[in-house]
Amino acid sequence: MKPSIRPHSAVLFVGLFAWIAFNASAAVAPRPPEQMMEEATHVVEGKVVAIVSKTQKSKVERGLLIARDRIFEITLETTMVDKGEGIKKGDPLTLQAWQPSIRFPAMPGPQGHQPVPANGDLVKVYLLYNEKSKTYHPFMPNGISILGPPRKTK
């Protein structure tokens, strides 16, 4: 009688599936505005004056995965500062947001910032300042609130 490879394949398959399921992360739940206001280093409102994006290898997802993220560099003209020091009305402020671009195999996980504003949108952003990289990052996933299209001024 020849030994069968099927039991070994089944064990390998179940083990691989269990490992992937154990290491899979879930989407991040939206935070209430009160919690973001309390935890943020800066909270500002402004008009989006520039938005640039690029796709790069993911810093969020790792492992047996082909993962690319779309990184957005968003520049605001600050119209109001609700919290934080070092930013004044009228100052330009650049922040970084991201969304997944490619995931193979498709797995659940963080979905980045939702929504990402368009050029000209009025937004309120709840930010965390990273001292090391000197960059601002909105809370994930809902640290960017679109207040509306730009207001017309006379």
Residue ranges and their predicted role:
Residues K2-L12:
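Bacterial N-terminal signal peptides that target proteins for export
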Residues V11-A21:
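Bacterial N-terminal signal peptides
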Residues S4, W19-K154:
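Transition segments tied to proteolytic processing and entry into folded domains
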